[in-house]
Amino acid sequence: MKTPRAWQRMLSGRRLDLLNPSPLDVEIEDIAHGLCFVARWNGQTDGEFPYSVAEHSLLVERIFTLVNPKSTAQWRLVALLHDAPEYVIGDMISPVKNAIGPHYSKLEDRLIEAIHIRFGLPALIPVKIKAQI
């Protein structure tokens, strides 16, 4: 049986394999561009403009830094990139994630690990840090 196509061509020209992502195929410009166009909560927010995942990511990093003023640049970057996989898989709401089951979480985990490695961050984040984000 032939393996289905599971990659996406990014604006940078990189080809990101969604099932086996390589840190070498992750570019910050692709992440920033993608997250700017992804609306939180499927666009179900009040206001004239959608609330983007990019804006949310900046807010989370800012709050994390305010709560943890002595945090390192490394942990602030982890906070900023906490939803980075959504640049290619979108901002799926939790009820849908739960309905899909563990396959979605595995996909998301592989993407965040590749993203972290690409930017010199630990692939796995300590529970204490993750809970603060």
Feature locations, PLM:
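Metal-dependent phosphohydrolase cores
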Residues: 1-133
